[in-house]
């Protein structure tokens, strides 16, 4: 089967570090992502999807590429407007393919379809690649850091969109998962990727309240650790700290 990875994670650097701190600092990929992939016997990624160019989504790409064979990097066309990102891609010298709404990637018993962006953006939050897929009877929506503006565009383009599992946009921030979006997609489960005690205080209490009002089951990486979907004919959800 194919292995698809959406975003690598990465540390946002909030200023200059002393040299000894730089040397001792290890990436999130070295601490968690790479060991996990190796533990599952994964040494090859067929599609490395980078939703957008924020460091906390693609900052560990170079570290990952040194340890795992990446067959193809998938990005939005707007991401190519960021010079530092383009320089990184050239340095890695790996196959790169841009994705746009309507493209499909085969995975499991179905495919993941790109729903967004619908036009060329700038690689920022509202230019995030959004993927929708139906796998073993459940529907999933992965939204990167998409915020309200992008969610409204998505609703206008796909007025019948319904999903079972939502990967909440922008780490559960206040500016994403707006009420009209949540009411339309009718997701039963929200997955929130956020660092423990992060400085942004993600997820925002307002967003959590919206999920609660709609009786959604919420899984949070800051509280429960890794969230794993396992199964073949049906899904079982596990959390691993």
Task: Name each model-derived stretch.
Residues 1-241:
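Non-globular, low-confidence helical/coil segments that flank catalytic cores
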């Amino acid at each position: 089967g194919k292995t698809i990875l959406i975003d690598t994670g990465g540390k946002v650097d909030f200023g200059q570090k002393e040299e000894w701190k730089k040397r001792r600092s290890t990436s999130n990929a070295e601490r968690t992502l790479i060991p996990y992939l190796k533990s599952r016997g994964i040494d090859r990624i067929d599609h490395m999807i980078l939703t957008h160019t924020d460091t906390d989504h693609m900052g560990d790409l170079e570290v990952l590429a040194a340890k795992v064979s990446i067959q193809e990097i998938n990005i939005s066309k707007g991401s190519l407007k960021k010079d530092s990102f383009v320089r990184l891609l050239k340095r890695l010298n790996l196959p790169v393919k841009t994705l746009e709404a309507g493209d499909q990637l085969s995975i499991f018993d179905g495919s993941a379809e790109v729903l967004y962006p619908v036009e060329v953006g700038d690689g920022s939050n509202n230019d995030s690649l959004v993927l929708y897929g139906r796998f073993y009877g459940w529907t999933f929506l992965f939204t990167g850091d998409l915020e309200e503006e992008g969610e409204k565009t998505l609703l206008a383009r796909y007025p019948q969109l319904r999903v079972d599992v939502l990967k909440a946009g922008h780490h559960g921030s206040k500016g994403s998962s707006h009420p009209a979006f949540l009411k339309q997609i009718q997701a039963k489960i929200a997955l929130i990727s956020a660092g423990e005690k992060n400085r942004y205080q993600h997820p925002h209490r307002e967003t959590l309240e919206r999920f609660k009002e709609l009786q959604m089951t919420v899984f949070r990486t800051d509280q429960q650790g890794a969230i794993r979907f396992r199964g073949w004919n049906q899904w079982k959800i596990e959390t691993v700290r």
